[in-house]
Amino acid sequence: YKNAECDELLFVHEGTGVLKTFVGNLEFSVGDYLIIPRGTIYQLELNSENNVFLFLESHSPIYTPKRYRNEFGQLLEHSPFCERDIETPTFVEPKDEKGDFLIKVKKENQIWDFIYATHPFDVVGWDGFFYPFKFNIKNFEPITGRVHLPPPIHQTFEAHNFVVCSFVARMYDYHPLAIPAPYNHSNIDSDEVLFYTEGDFMSRNHIDLMD
């Protein structure tokens, strides 16, 4: 499969497997974010029958938050994760095969069939900064405060018109006079989508996983 118009973010809620790409393989498991740049030919090989993914598409690249990076693109010390937490593909031997290889390509919101005469993973090496990667949510080190902090403090990724936040287990609002959770309010600047993958959320009650 190749998405020729959008970058993709896959969050693994259930299941394990391997993300196979023309630049190498990434093993994934529960809690992994998979970032797949547009134009990447890939295949998901699943190891289990029960697999649940949260799937997002972006017409702009998906980055780490700008405020966590210096002018050279390096993650700063106050970032909730660092470069060592990001895993890149493991190189595999090229598939020197000929035949009819069907590639599903998404373009202009349609799926097109392309037949390759050689295996799309017939690659002997790659160079540059264009590759898929993974980051596990359990490596996200939350930033906490004695009083309530706004949701952007949990930001993990950003694109042109949306952000992705990771609300993980943490101490929160531990000042003796702090309001323990935000009171009823209206967010007129942003639409919010919450995906429950584990545990309970501080400001919502009686919600089950994947609600």
Task: Name each model feature, range by range.
Residues Y1-D211:
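Jelly-roll (double-stranded beta-helix
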